[in-house]
C-alpha cells in the first residue's frame, strides 16, 4: 500500500476535526454523567452552558476572570455552578458566609486539591504544601515549614533583613539617579524577598548572588509559561497542541535550571534552623526537596513583591495617604534612623494600608481551588467527593454590603479610633471578611512572614523616598493580569525623591 500523503493544511483540518468530534463526544458523556449524579447531588443554580466551551462565553469581555465571576454572582448569588471549558463543573463561592462554610466549618471536607498539568511539572506532581491533599504528608510539610518561620526564628533574621534593605535602598537610589529619578520598583522588591527567603531555606548566613538572580529569572519565566498554558486548563485535550507541548517542554527546562542552582547547596551539616535541613532529614525524594524549595521561592517572592508594589501604586495616586503614612513612620523613627522590623507592630496606619491593599488586590483573587475530599454537604446540599469549589476572594472583598465604597482605597476603614462610629463600615465585620490568604486548615502557611516582608519593604521605601507620578497627572495604571498571582499588567513606574535624612548625610 502506498504511503498516505497529507498536505500541511489538510493535516491540520483533519486534526482539528478529530479534536472537535472527540471533545463533543467527551462533553456529551460528561454532561450525561453530571446529570445522572445530580439525582444525588444538589448543585447551586448557575448560568446556562454551551457545548464544549461551557460558560467561557460569559467569562470574557476583556475583564479579569475574578471580575467576570463577581458579575455573575450579582445574578446567581453567593454560590453558583459553572463549567469552565472542560468537562467538570465547579461551584463558585462569592460571599463570606458561604466561604466560611467551605473554608472553616467544613475545612477538612473540602481540603483536597486538583493540580493543573503544567504545575505538576514544578510541584513533583502535586507533592508540596499548596497543592497536595491534606493528610500526614501535608501535615508534616507544613509543620516543618512552621518550625523555620516561627516568630523567634524570623526575628533572629531581622538584623540581616534590615541590612539587605539598606543595600536595596542604595541600589534604588543609584538606579533612579541614572534615569531622571524614575524607577520600576518590582525587581527591587523581588530582590529583597529573594534574599530573606534564601536565608530561611538555606540558613541565616547564606549569600549567593548567582542563585538569587538565577531563581528570580526562572520564576519570571514560569509565570510567563503558566499564563500561556491556561488553554490546557480549560480544555484538557489542548495539551496535545504544538503550542501547549512547547509550554510543557519549556516548563521542564526552566524547572531543571532551578534544580541545578539548588543542588550544589544540599550539603552535609546544613544549619539546623534552615528549611533545607528539615527537608533533608525526612525520607523525601530529591524531586520533592527541590519542588519544596521552589515553592517557597515561587509563592513567597512574587506575592510579597507584587503586594508591596500594588501598595506603592495606590500611594502614588493618593498623595495624602502616602504623607500620612510617612508622618507615622517618621514619628516612630524620629527621622534619625532607618525603619527596623520591631517598628512594624507600632505602626497602625501602615497595617491599615496593608489590609486595604490586600482587600482591593488579593494576591490570589480566586485562591487555590478546593476539592471535596469525601461526600459531604454545602448549606444543606449534597456534594459528592471530587467536586471542585472556587472561592472568589475578589468578590468577597468588594461586597458593598460589607465594605462601603468597595472600589475606593480607604485605609481608615480598618482603624478603630477613626472608624469607631462605623462610617466606613462595621470594622468587626470587615476584619472577619478580609481573608486574602484564605482561612481554615488550608490557610497560607507563611501568612505572618509574608505580611512582615511586605510591611517592612513598604515602610522602608516610603520612609526613604517620596513617590510621585512619572509625569504630572499620569496616575499608575491599575489594570490587572493574573498567572500564579495577581500582578500589574503594566508594572509600576514612579518618580522617587530621597527624603531628607540626617543619618544619611
From Swiss-Prot:
Optimum pH is 8.5. One of its GO terms (cellular component) is endoplasmic reticulum membrane. One of its GO terms (molecular function) is salutaridine synthase activity. Disruption phenotype: Accumulation of upstream metabolites, such as reticuline, but reduced production of morphine. The keyword RNA-binding does not apply. Its cofactor is heme. It is a single-pass membrane protein. Keywords: Endoplasmic reticulum, Heme, Iron, Membrane, Metal-binding, Monooxygenase, Oxidoreductase, Transmembrane, Transmembrane helix. Induction: Up-regulated by elicitor treatment. One of its GO terms (biological process) is morphine biosynthetic process. The keyword Iron applies. It is found in: Endoplasmic reticulum membrane. It catalyses: (R)-reticuline + reduced [NADPH--hemoprotein reductase] + O2 = salutaridine + oxidized [NADPH--hemoprotein reductase] + 2 H2O + H(+). Its main location: endoplasmic reticulum. InterPro entries: Cyt_P450, Cyt_P450_E_grp-I, Cyt_P450_sf. It is an enzyme of class 1 (oxidoreductase). Belongs to the cytochrome P450 family. Cytochrome P450 monooxygenase involved in biosynthesis of morphinan-type benzylisoquinoline and opiate alkaloids natural products. Catalyzes the formation of the morphinan alkaloid salutaridine by intramolecular phenol oxidation of (R)-reticuline without the incorporation of oxygen into the product. Can also use (R)-norreticuline as substrate. This is Salutaridine synthase. The lineage of its organism: Eukaryota, Viridiplantae, Streptophyta, Embryophyta, Tracheophyta.
